[in-house]
Amino acid sequence: MGIRIYNDLTRKKEDFVPLEPGKVRFYNCGPTVYDYFHIGNARNFVVFDTVRRYLEYRGYQVTFVQNFTDIDDRMIKRARERGITVSELAEEMIQAYFADAGALGVRPADVHPRATALIDEQIAMIQQLIDKGHAYVVEGGDVYFRVTTSPDYGKLSHKNLEELVAGASERVDPDDRKEHPFDFALWKGQKPGEPAWPAPWGPGRPGWHIECSAMARKYLGDTIDIHAGGEDLTFPHHENEIAQSEAVTGKPFARYWMHNAHLMIDGAKMSKSVGNFFTVRDILKRYDGEVVRMFLLSAHYRTQLSFSDQLMEDTRRALERLYNTVANLEHLAKTAPRAEMTAEEQAVLAELSQARERFVAAMDDDFNTAEGLAVIFDLSRELNSRVKPGASAAFAEGGLALLRELAGVLGLLERKAQPQELDAEIEALIAARQEARKARNFAEADRIRDQLRAMGIILEDTPQGVRWRRA
């Protein structure tokens, strides 16, 4: 069996079959760069970075595009508040994004298009929509998409127009220039003091939805394999992307739609508009980025995840246990009395390698990172119990390579387990303890043992001498 993806378009798991064998065209809706992103936003970036990593692990050539929305009402408002230009605000926050996302192990996309860099492409799409009767210009230079020309409008949110109107009257823009309450802006006519670009129907700026359609089409073509985003983007943003893109091309816009669930705090969605959020920049002052990443992968991406300091501490300790295993294996490999594996060690390593099959089965099932992590922790425990002092270097190195391989797919265990200077400190303490024992200063020897235990170091007396491992 291969990868199966829960497709929000059909609301069922489907076999993943890309448009072009071996290649994946993947678009993720990126941030609006008016502020530092919060940990709820980070879940999206980490989840779909991991999906990309796993697709590559399974042998696909992935073209991953994640945009920056660098012009909208919020950006204009924030730039005015700070007394800077919208482009200056965008540049500052884009650089902040790369710094903060990088701290979480999120790799840069193959392309990070900015909406303002593709104005011509957006104008061209809008003109095509006008020419085909799917859009209309109103007084003031605004252009609206005519939703009644999209016969399957609502197919992603699984509601028809009548149901949408009946259930969302408070969210509908009451603009009487619109033909239908759900017609949406493709172009916004210029207002005093706002950035604007020339267009055939008058100066202004693009609407949010057409920005993503144009950027996805520019770099991935008329039909893409996977379109991803947070679940709050399903309607209206992604619904509107589908309507306008398919009206232009006459082709399916995206074949698989993936949405990550919200991050919750105190039972409510974490949101900048509500104010119940923590920026990643602030959280990184308290926790290592790898801890944050593992926390965000600890639940299946379609399951709501609650944020708390207790859960973050639990995650920190869990990650520490994995690094302790790495450090133990590195130490055993470095101090091994022999290089080659015995037949018994080869058999044990082959048995442990079955973890790879379990990991792949978990991730093939709609990218179940929670189950994938469980496999990694099971492997870590097995390695600690079965790779003992006296093992061959090849045995320890083989176990370590397997652990790093699987964890690396999730973007974990990519740094060195412990700095060399700490290893040297531990060795010095062990030597001091040995000297104390020789001098029959058992109180001092016990004190050093307790100090090492407090550092998470367990001493083991062997025929070859004292060995140590991390608890």
UniProtKB/Swiss-Prot annotation:
SUPFAM superfamilies found in the cross-reference section: Anticodon-binding domain of a subclass of class I aminoacyl-tRNA synthetases, Nucleotidylyl transferase
Cofactor: Zn(2+)
Keyword Signal: no
Chief location: cytoplasm
Cofactor note: Binds 1 zinc ion per subunit.
Enzyme Commission designation: 6.1.1.16
Stored CDD domains: Anticodon_Ia_Cys, CysRS_core
Residues engaged in binding ATP: K272
Single GO molecular function: zinc ion binding
Catalytic activity, reaction form: tRNA(Cys) + L-cysteine + ATP = L-cysteinyl-tRNA(Cys) + AMP + diphosphate
Quaternary assembly: Monomer.
Name of protein: Cysteine--tRNA ligase
Taxonomic source organism: Symbiobacterium thermophilum (strain DSM 24528 / JCM 14929 / IAM 14863 / T)
Taxonomic lineage of the native organism: Bacteria, Bacillati, Bacillota, Clostridia, Eubacteriales
Gene name, Swiss-Prot/TrEMBL: cysS
